[in-house]
Regions:
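Active-site-proximal segment of zinc-dependent metalloprotease catalytic domains
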Residues: 31-408, 412-415, 566-571, 585, ...
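Secretory targeting and sorting signals
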Residues: 1-28
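Exoplasmic/lumenal beta-rich domain surfaces
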Residues: 535-601, 632-644, 649-659, 739-741, ...
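Extended, low-complexity, turn-rich repeat/linker tracts enriched in Gly/Pro/Ser/Thr and Asp/Glu
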Residues: 496, 509-511, 522-530, 612-615, ...
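Extracellular hydrolytic enzyme modules, especially secreted metalloproteases
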Residues: 324-326, 330-496, 504, 653-690
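Short beta-strands within extracellular/lumenal beta-sheet-rich domains
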Residues: 491-510, 585-593
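Extracellular carbohydrate recognition
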Residues: 529-531, 610-628
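Extracellular beta-strand-rich recognition modules
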Residues: 515-523, 601-609, 638
Length: 915
């Protein structure tokens, strides 16, 4: 598929009814009661089956703002279950603060073995629904551009599908070698695949041969959700459940999944009479179950206090909300073209029912849920359940790039691996397991001595070995802004979703014909989603009125009276108006006209309101001044402390944060390296069966399997500066041009693999680079060569064609050092500068975050030394790209010394950064 980008979603207004402005506190009672709120709503889409070919960004120094939409779209939808994610974030912060691992304090409060019980509902759709879509304007195909649409003729009625109507891929006219399919998707099938040890013992897709033994049919026995979570957690976590169904929803799938014209492929806005879209399916499913089985044991599925609602640190207690709701929808998924339903299909996702929904006849609610298609393998269940536990996506969900993670992590494309699609998902990476308390890497701090560590394999880690290595870097202040004057400014903070935070003061407004309150503003506020307000109260703070804000030239910079409020957040925040939003691009001198309040004593405050998911830098304000007829009567440069200002925290739901503080323009960030040993063992055998799509059309799907270079050592870089792995907007950020994200792999073979011969001739792209999932196949540091591979391309306008390139094995790389670059940099081609492979690997940090050169090479990879020293703008200079060449390396080194017998691990030499 050519285009898989994120959707913008809005939270239904009903979710905010009854919302309060205070955060909950721990209750004296031990009885937990979780009340899902708007801050718990999210929607996160399963990774696309086929990798998009991203458009190469323009040359460095171009307009970065032109790419901001991809960031806005994605950051709304890359995170996991917010209630659980807040717990994981707190664990990470405590671990970094104390120097311990999350497992050290998790298991002191709960028993080490937890078994989650999943309510699993198989849902098919009413074959007699006759949902009327006459005149509905929809996307033409799942792959269509947003404006490539089709209006349904009068009399268009939608019904079904029922289960067991997906065609057998073996009967298709064109070769399909990767689609998962069984004859009967029965409750027994799902019970075996999810909740047993043996799994599905009958071979699947008997038209294909198993690559392991050459026999007809693919053997997927033993690869179950239960076994996977037990293996990843080293026995600390398991799942159980029993599939219920098939339940028949009252409507067609189209009612829930229809993609409207103007949307993106994942759009599931549904029928115009269904305001919740796909979210209504969870409600309808439990309604049908409650009606048909009035004695259903709902309480059996409420064993956990997922959010620690009562604040007692005990997560192993009921909280009144079903812990884990798993839905399976009949038919194919929209992510694999939707099958017979096409754009009317549902896209696999994890989400929550906004505000929760009470199960009829009970005092229990549903909130968080995951949904997968009928023909899913175990991988997508494992991936979406990871979101249920609070984990984010690690792939570049914007579709504008391919982050260097791919099949190395379940929370990226690892869910899709196996000899047949999704049959043998790969492990979570070390960071995922660490925050969940399932791995405790050996910790090194700046200034520690160089040491040897015996690191065991990630899957079924041997005794007397370490789970991995964590190398902490010094906590660095990140420069956000320079205060307008002096050393301080007021700052709204950026650590709170659904914030309603203010800083205000009393003001005696002087008499005069032109009274103005001036301030210097510097803000980055999520455009049209989050807002700042300057508000005035004349009744002691009982009521507040938003004021228009003007710049020095007298132009209004707040939302005008006719502002359409496209995301309805001004309404959500209390029917407000006159909000500031967007990005000032630096300091700007603004004012509020207070002439109408002349001679009065008023209260004035700056208020910052945010919604869920994406919270940019926020609002800095400095150098306040009150003038009357041009003369200054009061001023405050924020250098004397609060000086009469008072900060007030608040929330629209149940979130909390630091609120407004006096800030020097910096914030502390945490960065560290992680290293783990991966081997073809257990579920990580799936690393042998990554893939690259050759063609996907007319229901048929052909791939080339790609073997990742295990056994080997993965080196991860975790950077809290970033909230996800959307790469394109951060390419030109400090310290050097290249990939930056929240958690990326250092690619030991970062130079791109490229198509050759006829395949290159048919490839319309400039560099002929292979897709990202193939590029990352050789990322691990290893003692041996990488594996040969074959990659095939379907040429444009030549359906089902195959033009292939073969690549031989490359020499293994045994040592990581932050003295050298691991990013391919720029290349000189036809007299111009271009990204060599813009979304590859990651940029390593430098001492004090100092800028260092960006690598520049010729097309053949040789250094383009004649360009060294060239300033290309934005503070970037071309050179070797090696921080060590400029004395700016932190001094981190991770070196392979020797493998353990059977490749069960490796002895690793770790050099921590200098203090």
């Amino acid at each position: 598929m050519s285009r898989k980008t994120r959707l913008l979603a809005t939270i239904p207004a009903v979710a905010l009814l009854g919302a309060t402005l205070t955060a909950p506190t721990a209750q004296a009672s031990s009885v937990a009661r979780y009340e899902p709120g708007p801050s718990d709503f999210y929607i996160n889409y399963a990774p696309p089956r086929d990798e998009a070919t991203p458009e190469e960004p323009g040359a460095p120094g171009g307009d970065k703002r032109s790419r901001s939409r991809a960031r806005e779209i994605d950051q709304k939808h890359s995170l996991g279950n917010p209630a659980a994610a807040r717990v994981l974030a707190a664990r990470e912060q405590e671990a970094l603060r104390t120097g311990r691992n999350p497992a050290d304090f998790i298991f002191k409060k709960t028993k080490q073995t937890r078994t989650a019980k999943l309510l699993t509902l198989l849902v098919e759709f009413n074959e007699n629904a006759d949902d009327d879509f006459s005149g509905y304007n929809r996307l033409r195909t799942v792959d269509s551009a947003p404006d490539d649409c089709l209006v349904e003729p009068a009399g268009t009625l939608k019904n079904g599908p029922l289960h067991n109507n997906i065609p057998d891929p073996a009967t298709l006219p064109n070769k399909d070698n990767n689609s998962f399919w069984v004859k009967d998707f029965s409750p027994e099938h799902f019970n075996k695949m999810l909740y047993t040890d043996k799994g599905i013992t009958e071979r699947v897709r008997k038209d294909l041969k198993d690559p392991r033994d050459g026999r007809p049919g693919i053997d997927i026995s033993g690869f179950t959700l239960k076994k996977m979570y037990e293996e990843m957690s080293k026995g600390a976590y398991s799942v159980t459940g029993s599939a219920v169904g098939w339940i028949k929803a009252p409507h067609s799938e189209a009612w829930y999944g229809a993609a409207a014209c103007g949307g993106n492929p994942q759009d599931m806005s549904g029928h115009p009479d269904n305001p919740l879209g796909a979210g209504q399916l969870a409600i309808d499913a439990v309604n049908v179950l409650a009606q048909t089985q009035p004695d259903f044991p709902w309480a059996d599925y409420d064993l956990e206090d997922v959010s620690d609602a009562d604040g007692d640190g005990n997560f192993a207690e009921p909280d009144g909300v079903i812990d884990h709701l798993v839905l399976v929808h009949a038919g194919k998924d929209k992510s694999s073209d939707g099958g017979a339903e096409g754009t009317y299909a549902i896209w696999a996702h994890s989400s929550a029912v906004a505000g929760g929904y009470q199960v009829p006849g009970t005092d229990m609610k549903i909130s968080n849920y995951i949904v997968q298609p009928e023909d899913s393998g175990v991988g997508v269940f494992a991936h979406e359940y990871g979101h249920d536990l609070g984990l984010p996506d690690l792939y570049d969900t914007s579709g504008a790039g391919s982050s260097a993670v791919d099949f190395w992590d379940l929370m990226s494309s690892g869910s899709h691996s196996g000899p047949i699609f999704q049959s043998m998902p790969t492990h979570m990476g070390l960071w995922d397991k660490w925050v969940l308390g399932w791995a405790s890497p050996k910790v090194f701090d700046p200034g520690d001595r160089k040491s040897l560590v015996t690191v065991g394999q990630s899957s079924r880690t041997p005794k007397l070995t370490q789970d991995g290595v964590r190398v902490n870097l010094a906590s660095e202040p990140l420069k956000m802004v320079d205060p307008h004057s002096g050393g301080n400014a007021w700052w709204s903070g950026m650590d709170q979703e659904w914030a309603n935070v203010s800083v205000g003061r009393d003001i005696d407004v002087p008499a005069g014909s032109d009274v103005r309150f001036w301030m210097w503003n510097n803000y980055e506020i999520e455009s049209d989603w989050d807002f700042g307000f300057v508000e005035v109260s004349t009744d002691g703070g009982a009521t507040w009125a938003q004021q228009k804000v003007f710049d020095e030239a007298g132009d209004e910079i707040t939302t005008p009276d006719d502002y359409p409020d496209p995301n309805k957040n001004l309404a959500t925040f209390g029917d407000k108006k006159y909000g500031i939003t967007g990005d000032t691009g630096g300091w700007r001198h603004d004012y509020v006209d207070l002439t109408s309040f002349a001679g009065q004593s008023i209260k004035l405050r700056l208020t910052y309101n945010t919604d869920a998911a994406f919270t940019p830098r926020g609002w800095h304000a400095d150098d306040f001044e009150l003038t009357s007829d041009g003369a200054t009567v009061w001023s405050d440069d924020v250098e004397g402390g609060e000086n009469g200002w008072r900060a007030t925290g608040g929330t629209f739901t149940n979130t909390s944060g630091q609120g407004w503080t006096i800030n020097n323009g910096e914030r502390e960030i945490q960065r560290f390296y992680l290293a783990e040993w991966r081997n073809f063992d257990g579920f990580d055998k799936g690393l042998q069966y990554a893939y690259d799509t050759t063609y996907s059309r007319d229901g048929a799907w052909k791939v080339e399997k790609v073997k990742y270079n295990a056994p080997g050592l993965l080196v991860w870089y975790r950077d809290s500066t970033y909230t996800n792995n959307v790469l394109v907007n951060n390419l030109e950020a400090a310290p050097s041009i290249g990939s930056k994200g929240t958690l990326l792999l250092v690619d030991s073979h970062f130079d791109p693999l490229r198509r050759t011969g006829e395949a290159a001739a048919k490839d319309p792209t400039r560099h002929k680079n292979m897709e990202g999932r193939t590029q990352t196949s050789n990322a691990a540091f290893s003692f041996r060569n990488t594996y040969p591979l074959k990659e095939c391309l379907e040429a444009p306008d030549e359906p089902f064609s195959e033009y292939c390139t073969r690549i031989g094995g490359l020499k293994g790389v045994k040592e990581f050092t932050d003295a050298k670059t691991w990013y391919p940099g720029l290349e000189v081609q036809d007299g111009g500068l271009f990204y060599r492979d813009f979304d590859a690997s990651t940029v390593v940090p430098s001492k004090g975050d100092q800028p260092y050169s960006t690598r520049v090479v010729n097309v053949d990879g040789t250094p383009a030394t004649e360009y060294y020293g060239l300033d290309i703008g934005g503070g970037h200079v071309l050179g070797s790209g090696n921080p060590g060449d400029e004395g700016k390396a932190l001094g981190v080194g991770i070196k392979l010394i020797s493998p353990l017998p059977g490749d069960l691990g490796a002895i690793v030499q770790v050099t921590p950064p200098k203090k």
